[in-house]
A protein has these predicted regions:
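SDR active-site strand-loop-helix element
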Residues: 12, 35, 77, 115-120, ...
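NAD(P)H-binding glycine-rich loop region in Rossmannoid oxidoreductase-like domains
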Residues: 40, 47-110, 121-125
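Structural motif
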Residues: 8, 72-73, 114
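N-terminal Rossmann NAD(P)H-binding glycine-rich loop of SDR-like oxidoreductase domains
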Residues: 2-29
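Conserved glycine-rich Rossmann-like NAD(P)H-binding loop of the short-chain dehydrogenase/reductase
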Residues: 30-38
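A short helix->loop->beta-strand "cap" motif at the edges of active sites that frequently abuts
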Residues: 109-114, 146-147
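Residues in the short beta-alpha loop(s) of Rossmann-like NAD(P)-binding domains
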Residues: 38-39, 220
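Oxidoreductase cofactor-interface core, primarily capturing Rossmann-like NAD(P)-dependent enzymes
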Residues: 2, 17, 22, 45, ...
Length: 223
């Protein structure tokens, strides 16, 4: 009896600690293509069973469509923080929307069944409002061509080696007194990385999660 084909997932934004862990975890059940942004990052990755690493220029619609061809699902973890050499005059929000549009358009053309977007929960204040608006716009861009979209909104994801965890550790150990903006003085509900992976896995296997938004967090609310 022929073995059933594994469903294929493209993980966009797999270069960070969260994306790398998500890719490796999903490869236990799916065939995973993990995307990084440069060939330098690609050299640091080792393939594993049912896990391959690819470099992709996210601003190139041709490159994006090439890597998404044949994929059943798209996990979208891309967050632009600073301009690149290709787009050095653009604002981060413009780049976020351009990249999201490239992936959404290609996902629709190639018949991707579902996009899962890991966004963020940000509360109050001017800066956080701007970030929240940007992420809402990214979610809208990912859904505009009709591919079913699931949005998972998380606060701080506690993951070994993540930028947020390293930043908090450096602040706690090196700065005895820290002045923080008003928007940062809010209650947070951090979530462990394994719980994020479980949420993504659940959404992949349950059709009722499509075209739905979920706020995910751990059991503790902290300041």
């Amino acid at each position: 009896m022929p073995q059933q084909r594994r469903r294929k997932i493209l993980v966009a934004g797999a270069g960070g600690s969260i994306g790398s862990a998500v890719s490796r975890a999903l490869a236990k059940q799916y065939e995973v293509v993990a995307l990084v942004g440069s060939h330098e990052q690609l050299q640091e990755r080792e393939p594993a069973p049912f896990l391959s690493w690819r470099a992709c220029e996210p601003f190139s619609r041709r490159d994006v469509e090439k890597v998404i061809t044949g994929c059943d699902y798209l996990i979208y973890l891309v967050h632009t923080r600073v301009p690149t050499a290709r787009m050095d005059q653009a604002e981060c929000e413009d780049m976020d929307l351009l990249i999201a549009d490239n992936f959404a358009r290609s996902a629709n053309r190639q018949g991707v069944k579902q996009i899962i977007y890991l966004g963020g929960i940000i509360q109050g204040g001017n800066i956080s409002s701007e970030l929240l608006e940007r992420r809402n716009e990214v979610a809208e861009a990912l859904s505009i061509y009709g591919t079913p979209l699931t949005v998972l909104r998380a606060g701080l994801v506690v993951a070994p080696g993540s930028n947020a965890v390293r930043l908090l550790a450096n602040i706690a150990t090196r700065l005895p007194i820290v002045l923080i903006p008003q928007w940062a003085d809010k209650r947070q509900q951090p979530i462990a990385l394994p719980d994020v992976i479980r949420a993504i896995s659940y959404c992949l296997t349950n059709h009722e999660t499509r075209n739905t938004n979920y706020d995910i967090g751990g059991p503790m609310v902290l300041t």
